[in-house]
Amino acid sequence: CGSKSMVEHDVGFASPLNILKPIEPVKEFTLHITEEEKQSFGTYLQQQGIDLSKPIMLANVTAKLASKVWDEDRMVWVLDQFIKQFPDWQIIFNYAPGQEKTNAFRVYEKLGKPQQVFIDVQARSSRELVAMGYFMTLFFGNEGGARHIMHATGCPSLVICAPGNNKSVWLPQNSVPAEGIAATDLADAQTLVKMDKPQQYNLITQELVWEKLKAFVQRLQ
Protein backbone atom coordinates (compact mmCIF):
# COMPACT_ATOMS: atom_id res chain seq x y z
CA CYS A 1 0.00 0.00 0.00
CA GLY A 2 2.95 2.33 0.41
CA SER A 3 1.80 5.47 2.21
CA LYS A 4 -1.84 4.84 1.30
CA SER A 5 -4.41 3.45 3.69
CA MET A 6 -5.95 0.07 2.97
CA VAL A 7 -9.19 1.86 2.08
CA GLU A 8 -7.45 4.00 -0.55
CA HIS A 9 -5.64 0.91 -1.84
CA ASP A 10 -8.84 -1.09 -2.22
CA VAL A 11 -10.76 1.78 -3.82
CA GLY A 12 -7.96 1.91 -6.39
CA PHE A 13 -9.18 -1.37 -7.86
CA ALA A 14 -12.09 0.59 -9.31
CA SER A 15 -9.79 2.94 -11.26
CA PRO A 16 -10.20 1.09 -14.61
CA LEU A 17 -13.83 2.21 -14.54
CA ASN A 18 -12.61 5.77 -15.10
CA ILE A 19 -12.64 5.03 -18.83
CA LEU A 20 -16.43 4.82 -18.61
CA LYS A 21 -17.00 7.75 -16.29
CA PRO A 22 -14.75 9.74 -13.94
CA ILE A 23 -14.83 8.30 -10.43
CA GLU A 24 -14.71 10.56 -7.41
CA PRO A 25 -13.14 8.47 -4.63
CA VAL A 26 -14.41 9.06 -1.10
CA LYS A 27 -12.63 8.44 2.20
CA GLU A 28 -15.74 7.79 4.26
CA PHE A 29 -16.89 4.22 4.85
CA THR A 30 -19.86 2.91 6.77
CA LEU A 31 -21.59 -0.25 7.94
CA HIS A 32 -25.35 -0.19 8.14
CA ILE A 33 -27.81 -2.18 10.21
CA THR A 34 -31.54 -1.75 10.64
CA GLU A 35 -32.96 0.72 13.12
CA GLU A 36 -34.64 -2.23 14.85
CA GLU A 37 -31.27 -3.94 15.38
CA LYS A 38 -29.80 -0.75 16.78
CA GLN A 39 -32.72 -0.18 19.15
CA SER A 40 -32.62 -3.80 20.27
CA PHE A 41 -28.95 -3.57 21.19
CA GLY A 42 -29.52 -0.28 22.97
CA THR A 43 -32.19 -1.96 25.07
CA TYR A 44 -29.79 -4.81 25.82
CA LEU A 45 -27.13 -2.35 26.98
CA GLN A 46 -29.62 -0.69 29.31
CA GLN A 47 -30.66 -4.06 30.69
CA GLN A 48 -26.99 -4.69 31.48
CA GLY A 49 -26.86 -1.49 33.51
CA ILE A 50 -25.35 0.82 30.90
CA ASP A 51 -26.48 4.46 31.03
CA LEU A 52 -26.73 5.56 27.40
CA SER A 53 -26.58 9.23 28.42
CA LYS A 54 -23.00 8.78 29.66
CA PRO A 55 -19.85 8.14 27.58
CA ILE A 56 -18.84 4.55 26.84
CA MET A 57 -15.44 3.16 25.93
CA LEU A 58 -15.01 -0.13 24.08
CA ALA A 59 -11.62 -1.37 25.28
CA ASN A 60 -9.69 -3.89 23.20
CA VAL A 61 -7.53 -5.24 26.02
CA THR A 62 -6.56 -8.45 24.23
CA ALA A 63 -6.38 -9.98 20.74
CA LYS A 64 -6.47 -13.30 18.93
CA LEU A 65 -2.71 -13.20 18.31
CA ALA A 66 -0.39 -12.68 21.28
CA SER A 67 1.99 -10.77 18.99
CA LYS A 68 -0.65 -8.05 18.66
CA VAL A 69 -1.20 -7.50 22.38
CA TRP A 70 0.55 -4.67 24.21
CA ASP A 71 1.89 -5.45 27.70
CA GLU A 72 -1.07 -6.44 29.89
CA ASP A 73 0.15 -4.80 33.09
CA ARG A 74 0.73 -1.55 31.25
CA MET A 75 -2.80 -1.75 29.86
CA VAL A 76 -4.15 -2.30 33.38
CA TRP A 77 -2.22 0.72 34.65
CA VAL A 78 -3.55 2.96 31.87
CA LEU A 79 -7.15 1.84 32.41
CA ASP A 80 -6.78 2.39 36.15
CA GLN A 81 -5.61 5.95 35.49
CA PHE A 82 -8.51 6.44 33.09
CA ILE A 83 -11.10 5.28 35.63
CA LYS A 84 -9.68 7.63 38.26
CA GLN A 85 -9.55 10.61 35.88
CA PHE A 86 -12.88 9.97 34.13
CA PRO A 87 -15.12 8.19 36.67
CA ASP A 88 -18.33 8.88 34.71
CA TRP A 89 -17.16 6.84 31.75
CA GLN A 90 -18.40 3.28 31.34
CA ILE A 91 -16.12 0.60 29.88
CA ILE A 92 -16.94 -2.52 27.89
CA PHE A 93 -14.21 -5.05 27.09
CA ASN A 94 -14.08 -6.44 23.56
CA TYR A 95 -13.16 -10.14 23.55
CA ALA A 96 -13.97 -13.40 21.79
CA PRO A 97 -14.70 -16.72 23.53
CA GLY A 98 -11.75 -18.81 24.66
CA GLN A 99 -8.33 -17.35 25.41
CA GLU A 100 -9.43 -13.77 24.71
CA LYS A 101 -12.17 -14.08 27.33
CA THR A 102 -9.68 -15.51 29.81
CA ASN A 103 -7.32 -12.61 29.15
CA ALA A 104 -10.07 -10.00 29.45
CA PHE A 105 -11.31 -11.38 32.76
CA ARG A 106 -7.73 -11.42 34.07
CA VAL A 107 -7.41 -7.71 33.23
CA TYR A 108 -10.73 -7.12 34.99
CA GLU A 109 -9.44 -8.92 38.08
CA LYS A 110 -6.19 -6.94 38.07
CA LEU A 111 -8.20 -3.71 37.93
CA GLY A 112 -10.06 -4.80 41.06
CA LYS A 113 -13.40 -5.40 39.28
CA PRO A 114 -14.36 -1.70 39.11
CA GLN A 115 -18.03 -0.85 38.73
CA GLN A 116 -17.22 1.19 35.62
CA VAL A 117 -16.30 -1.99 33.72
CA PHE A 118 -19.26 -4.00 32.40
CA ILE A 119 -17.39 -7.24 31.82
CA ASP A 120 -20.39 -9.36 30.78
CA VAL A 121 -21.66 -7.12 27.96
CA GLN A 122 -21.15 -8.95 24.68
CA ALA A 123 -21.90 -8.62 20.99
CA ARG A 124 -22.80 -12.14 19.88
CA SER A 125 -22.54 -11.54 16.13
CA SER A 126 -20.87 -9.21 13.65
CA ARG A 127 -24.12 -7.31 13.24
CA GLU A 128 -24.43 -6.85 17.00
CA LEU A 129 -20.87 -5.50 17.06
CA VAL A 130 -21.91 -2.95 14.45
CA ALA A 131 -24.94 -2.08 16.56
CA MET A 132 -22.70 -1.67 19.60
CA GLY A 133 -20.52 0.77 17.68
CA TYR A 134 -23.35 3.25 17.31
CA PHE A 135 -23.49 3.60 21.11
CA MET A 136 -19.73 3.84 21.74
CA THR A 137 -17.98 7.13 22.45
CA LEU A 138 -14.45 5.80 22.02
CA PHE A 139 -12.56 2.68 20.97
CA PHE A 140 -9.25 2.22 22.79
CA GLY A 141 -6.66 -0.52 23.07
CA ASN A 142 -4.90 -2.96 20.78
CA GLU A 143 -5.40 -2.25 17.09
CA GLY A 144 -7.45 -4.90 15.30
CA GLY A 145 -10.50 -5.77 13.25
CA ALA A 146 -13.00 -4.46 15.79
CA ARG A 147 -11.49 -1.00 15.42
CA HIS A 148 -12.38 -0.93 11.73
CA ILE A 149 -15.97 -1.80 12.54
CA MET A 150 -16.14 0.95 15.16
CA HIS A 151 -14.65 3.42 12.68
CA ALA A 152 -17.35 2.54 10.17
CA THR A 153 -20.03 3.40 12.73
CA GLY A 154 -18.49 6.81 13.43
CA CYS A 155 -16.73 5.88 16.69
CA PRO A 156 -13.39 7.67 17.29
CA SER A 157 -10.42 5.47 18.13
CA LEU A 158 -7.01 5.59 19.76
CA VAL A 159 -5.05 2.36 19.43
CA ILE A 160 -1.68 0.81 20.15
CA CYS A 161 -0.26 -0.63 16.95
CA ALA A 162 1.68 -3.88 16.92
CA PRO A 163 5.28 -3.76 15.69
CA GLY A 164 5.43 -4.31 11.96
CA ASN A 165 1.96 -2.90 11.35
CA ASN A 166 2.01 0.37 9.42
CA LYS A 167 -0.49 2.65 11.10
CA SER A 168 -0.90 4.80 7.98
CA VAL A 169 -2.19 1.65 6.24
CA TRP A 170 -4.53 0.43 8.99
CA LEU A 171 -5.78 3.77 10.34
CA PRO A 172 -7.49 5.44 7.37
CA GLN A 173 -8.05 9.16 7.87
CA ASN A 174 -11.46 10.71 7.27
CA SER A 175 -14.03 12.64 9.31
CA VAL A 176 -13.86 10.07 12.15
CA PRO A 177 -10.88 10.69 14.48
CA ALA A 178 -8.49 7.72 14.38
CA GLU A 179 -5.07 7.84 15.98
CA GLY A 180 -2.41 5.26 16.72
CA ILE A 181 0.66 4.88 18.88
CA ALA A 182 3.46 2.84 17.32
CA ALA A 183 7.11 2.04 17.85
CA THR A 184 7.82 3.88 14.60
CA ASP A 185 6.80 7.08 16.38
CA LEU A 186 9.59 6.56 18.90
CA ALA A 187 12.59 5.26 16.97
CA ASP A 188 13.94 5.43 13.43
CA ALA A 189 14.00 2.51 11.02
CA GLN A 190 17.72 1.84 11.56
CA THR A 191 17.14 1.43 15.29
CA LEU A 192 13.98 -0.66 14.96
CA VAL A 193 15.52 -3.17 12.56
CA LYS A 194 17.95 -4.17 15.33
CA MET A 195 15.12 -4.84 17.79
CA ASP A 196 12.75 -7.80 18.06
CA LYS A 197 9.00 -7.25 18.40
CA PRO A 198 8.88 -7.39 22.23
CA GLN A 199 11.65 -4.78 22.39
CA GLN A 200 9.75 -2.56 19.96
CA TYR A 201 6.56 -2.95 22.01
CA ASN A 202 8.53 -1.97 25.13
CA LEU A 203 9.25 1.42 23.58
CA ILE A 204 5.57 2.23 24.07
CA THR A 205 5.43 3.17 27.74
CA GLN A 206 2.32 3.28 29.89
CA GLU A 207 2.95 6.95 30.64
CA LEU A 208 3.02 7.80 26.93
CA VAL A 209 -0.20 5.90 26.22
CA TRP A 210 -1.95 7.50 29.19
CA GLU A 211 -0.99 11.03 28.13
CA LYS A 212 -2.18 10.32 24.57
CA LEU A 213 -5.44 8.81 25.82
CA LYS A 214 -6.12 11.63 28.26
CA ALA A 215 -5.55 14.27 25.58
CA PHE A 216 -7.69 12.36 23.07
CA VAL A 217 -10.62 12.08 25.50
CA GLN A 218 -10.38 15.74 26.42
CA ARG A 219 -10.66 16.65 22.74
CA LEU A 220 -13.81 14.54 22.47
CA GLN A 221 -15.52 16.26 25.39
Where does each model-flagged region fall?
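Catalytic machinery of carbohydrate-active enzymes
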Residues: 1-221
